[in-house]
Amino acid sequence: MKMDHILVRYGELALKGKNRGHFEKLLLANIRHVLKPFPKVQAKRTFGRIVVELNSTDHEPVAAALANVFGIQSYSLALRVENELEAMQKGALFMLTQHPDAKTFKVSARRAYKLFPIDSQSLNHKIGSYVLKAFTGELAVDVHHPDVNVVVDVRESGTYITAGVYAGAKGLPVGSSGKVLHLLSGGIDSPVAAHMLMGRGAEVEMLHFHSPPYTNERAKQKVIDLTRELTKFGRTITLHFVPFTDIQTHIHKEVPSSYEMTIMRRMMLRIADRIARERGILAISNGESLGQVASQTLASMNTINEMTNLPVLRPLLAMDKETTIAYAKRIGTYETSILPYEDCCTIFLPTDSKTKPKRDRSAHFEQYVQVEEKCREAIAGIESLEVTGAHTSPTLDQLF
């Protein structure tokens, strides 16, 4: 015998009423995305859950991939047998042998297929008695707090037997809450913020500003690698590279150093706003944390936010750096984030940045930056990639 299925249970999406079908389809699509490395594995919707058929594939890497998918409340490794009592008994016995340290157990039969002739209570008794006899005193029944709960789920297509429940990523399926344009810097914070948004159902498109030759190809590859890490949580991610060298050198030349960071951030947000509107995206996000640096004070955020009417989401706003670092390590982005390749935010970094920049002063300095021309040129030079878990390729259609 071999565990040949994984039963996936829904999380919050089960509470979505009339939209449940839509959420289920999104979750199924996201599950199929993370299972692409396993060509024999199939996933399908059936009887109020998603069933993953392993088809002789090792269950451990498949279960590990499923554990990352938002929208999954829990999952169980399952053995499928025919709707025959003897097969159920032997199946339950096999599942218990996978828990050698267990001292107590119970059988919980669910006869969803009402044409099966043995009712649930009788199944509990018949299967439990068979297991007790096989273990000859090594196991005891505990119906209240068993070490192992053997669930026997009788369906028309067959009986699924499980003996353990594993926690999923919970949250909402990626894509169920709409799209967000996320500013991905290449540091520790922004990938964590993107992951948090994905957990609330947001489909993120990434926007990265790069400044060659001050930032090199390794810095660009680092951002691609971070984006690829995030695809394991649900789906392919579109990544946009905005050429920012000309804007950045122009700001450095024309703007007082105390306002350089503010004007640079305002230009980034201007460009992000235009890209988001072009693509029908309803919010912009980033990895800012309140008070972490000069550009992340409330006064700075207020002055920078002037460049858009779209919501600017900041999932890390109240998180400290240690918490963010621990989060990055948990989701697997930390080691890539700390690679020593500069991004555009570290170039020409002034030491006297204003922590309370004024809107009127910012607008005054922007008169010398040729804002409209520079924004148009940057957007015209965007390079867009579709990043998957396996490879990266240019988008087929011209996006801008």
UniProtKB/Swiss-Prot annotation:
THUMP domain residues: 60-165
Note the HAMAP family from the entry.
ThiI (MF_00021)
Q: Which UniProt keywords apply?
A: ATP-binding, Cytoplasm, Nucleotide-binding, RNA-binding, Thiamine biosynthesis, Transferase, tRNA-binding
Location in the cell reads: Cytoplasm
- Alphabetical list of InterPro entries matching this protein: Rossmann-like_a/b/a_fold (IPR014729), ThiI_AANH (IPR020536), ThiI_fer (IPR054173), ThiI_N (IPR049961), THUMP_dom (IPR004114), THUMP_ThiI (IPR049962), tRNA_STrfase (IPR003720), tRNA_sulfurtransferase_ThiI (IPR050102)
What is the similarity comment for this entry? Belongs to the ThiI family.
Entry EC number(s): 2.8.1.4
Query: What name is this protein filed under?
Result: Probable tRNA sulfurtransferase
Q: Which PROSITE patterns match?
A: THUMP
- The residues listed in the UniProt record as binding ATP, with positions renumbered to this chain, are L183, L184, H208, F209, R265, G287, Q296
